[in-house]
Amino acid sequence: MVLVGSPTTSVQGECNRGGEPIPGAVLVAESLGPELYEAIVVSAAVVCARGGRTGHMQSLCRSRGIPVLRVAPAELGSLVGEVTVRLDRESVLLGAAVPAPRAPGPAPARLDEVDSVCVVVADATDVRAVNALSPRVAQVDSYFIREEFACLSAELSPFDALRSGVAGARRYGAALADELCGMLAELLPGQRLVMRLLDLRSDDAAQITTGVPVEGEPNPELGLHGARWLLAEENYPHAFRALRGRLRELVGPAADRVSFAVPFINDRDEFERLRAHLGLGAGTPLGVFVETPAAVHSTAEFCVAGASELFVGTKDLIQFYLAADRGNHLVAATYQTRHPAVLAALRHAVTAGRGGGVPVHVFALGADVEHYVRRLPTRRLMMCTAELRQVALAAAERAAAERAAGERAAGERVAGERVAAGQVAGEPVAAAG
């Protein structure tokens, strides 16, 4: 099953079963976790045996345009040497194969009716790639980075740093600021950067934490992470203040182009307590990530409490509304991005946010963009880098085709006018018959 698609029909490469970063290889792994970050971002494709379409590492692959194919666990052991990943057939062939012609797929979405796009990125490379698109996607006015992805890019271990004491927390915050500055440097005039505060589930944290124990949880998805973890972590405010201070030190007023959003939060009480915990004054912008049913129904209260903007995280929201683990392939058919209950939740969040005068951004997979735009009262979307690139390239191809058609029509019109005037290339037109 294809978990993350690609414009290409097939990908060839040597199998990488060791998890080390090997550029252009096909990464083969039982499942995808943060410990494989460096290997994932340089891979040509990924083959795994577990996981769903919208897991965290799958989202990273979607951002980078790296295809991900899931195969049966029993088949994983046979994948060695050179292989060809056939996305059109949802299979892996041993050895090299003749590249298949590109199969026609659904037309990429159009952004004609979209006013704003917040692009989900993994590091400065993604920002640079989007801003280098030609023609430029004018609707792109912001970029969104998860703190945990910034950590992975900067090779930081947040739990180790935060639990080493106040000094370690401050060093961690300063290092994060350095990473964000690299992204700031890639922004175009009028663009900004939003960082979603740390939302590291215990199972993922255990993979990248070496110096302190990470308590296991029976259900990490519903465990201690997001806003509830931020409230419980006594050293996080020190890191956050160091981050903001270092940004101001490095870029001065341009630090105002960076804002922050709270992940995995339920209600106004959590929001107000977290603002106090972080030492944020009333005038400091702080957004909210709406990704639980409770948060959907608290949207209006978030606005009253001063949330600067709302980001609707459909990937988590869908799994909670439909009780379908987004990382479990056995319930993949139940995980429906267009389910009526999901659309009703999205519509409620957007309407309540707009009623409170707060911008609302809705995350959409590329295949869902037009569906959401037609059915939701929003023109603000969040999209992954690679999917936005496909949309932009398709728009450029359409524009070129329209120009060519216009030029042909103009040429035919001129020729027709000449015929009507009785002259073609300066000679009289012979009468027919």
What spans do the regions from the language model cover?
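Generic low-polarity alpha-helical segments
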Residues: 13-15, 27, 82-86, 117-119, ...
